[in-house]
Amino acid sequence: MKIFYKAINMTLSMFTVIPLPKYEWDDRAAKHIMKLYPFIGLIIGALWYLSFFVLSKLNVPIMLMAALILTVPYILTGFLHLDGFMDVSDALLSRRDKETKLRILKDSTVGAFSVISVVLLLLVEFAGMFTVLNKNLDMRILIFIPIASRVINGYFIVSQEMLGQSSLAKFFKEGTGKVDEIILLGIYVLVALITFFTLGINYLIAILAMGLISFILLLKVKKELGGINGDVAGYILVLMEFTGILLLGII
């Protein structure tokens, strides 16, 4: 139980900005982090929905509400995944050879492609959120989107080849195996079923589309970079959640 509690603490500390007591890194607890990654999604999703609930009760104008709600998951994660999205976008859009792309990925300099990509992402995502709010959809979907994105992300991290000596390989992949993959896939199926029975078919389509786009992105990244790392995981996660919001605005 102590190890499990420490694993929760470690997971929250690594993937959110939620203040927690200081802890010492424990390799035994680290192997449980990916199984707990969906729990991070649940917390972020609950706070995401809570932000909508509070803002709607305050009668905040829809356009402003859309902008504020959109920032919540990014703020809660310390812009961790958005940073990865920018880095990978810079590498992939460079249209260089594999070695150059990997060098760009490691470069801390903010490139033009990363800036263009994040501006377009946030602009379209804002339009999607604004449309979703205008359509008076069931905003409980905000709870499920971050869970689904992190389930799939966790599955990729434990099942796919890592780029070089990625820190993810050392801290998260070691000590995991087929059982972890099955658990994460099982959670994704459970999330899809709960979404369908509580919200309906259109919301299920959004969750399934997130899964589909994630595998398409994974194939693209593996082809161009050769594997995944923390930045790639963030890139895929951001675009999964973007897909979920955008699709809800369309269907």
Curated annotation (Swiss-Prot):
EC number: 2.7.8.26
UniProt entry keywords in alphabetical sequence: Cell membrane, Cobalamin biosynthesis, Magnesium, Membrane, Transferase, Transmembrane, Transmembrane helix
Keyword Transcription: no
Catalytic activity of the protein: alpha-ribazole + adenosylcob(III)inamide-GDP = adenosylcob(III)alamin + GMP + H(+); alpha-ribazole 5'-phosphate + adenosylcob(III)inamide-GDP = adenosylcob(III)alamin 5'-phosphate + GMP + H(+)
Domain of life: Bacteria
GO BP field: cobalamin biosynthetic process
Keyword Transmembrane: yes
GO molecular-function term, one example from the UniProt record: adenosylcobinamide-GDP ribazoletransferase activity
Membrane topology category: Multi-pass membrane protein
Biological or metabolic pathway of the protein: Cofactor biosynthesis; adenosylcobalamin biosynthesis; adenosylcobalamin from cob(II)yrinate a,c-diamide: step 7/7
Protein name: Adenosylcobinamide-GDP ribazoletransferase
UniProt-annotated location(s): Cell membrane
Role summary: Joins adenosylcobinamide-GDP and alpha-ribazole to generate adenosylcobalamin (Ado-cobalamin). Also synthesizes adenosylcobalamin 5'-phosphate from adenosylcobinamide-GDP and alpha-ribazole 5'-phosphate.
Cofactor: Mg(2+)
Disulfide bond positions: none
Stored Pfam families: CobS
Transmembrane domains' residue ranges: 36-56, 60-80, 110-130, 141-161, 181-201, 202-222, 231-251
Similarity-based family: Belongs to the CobS family.
GO cellular component, one term: plasma membrane
